[in-house]
Amino acid sequence: MSGPKDLKELTRSEWESLGFFYDYDDSGGTWLVRATRFGMERLCDELRRYALDPRNMEIAEHQHYGPYSYLKFVTWTEPKVIADGIYGRVDDFARLAEIIAAAIASAKPGDRIRIDEAYAMASEAKLELLLEPDNFKVASADPDLCSKRN
């Protein structure tokens, strides 16, 4: 039987495998993605993979990401960022990958980059990237894994 420590290790492993951390701040209406340059490239890869998957062509198709599956990419009629994820046509997801790649190319660790307006003007939420140093451990950003409880 697995206990809390096993669950924490599984969650930690899933974050590291994903390559980037995300969280949604309700009070500020902001998705924040934290990752190294490599992790940001992984995010771009996931966006491109979503765009290329023929199963995602239909409106309302979606994929969940991360150990908690909070972030989702959703095929929709227009690009937008809202509290439950990133929406758009499949070509919008490919375009978002290019926007992120271009923004990260000139960024330095510690830079915080707002992406939502470049992606979609009709967004209800913000999308920000925080470029972390190369030694950043994705799971270290998860407050549930860092708590002293359990």
Regions found by a protein language model. Give the residues of each.
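Positively charged, low-complexity terminal tracts
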Residues: 1-150
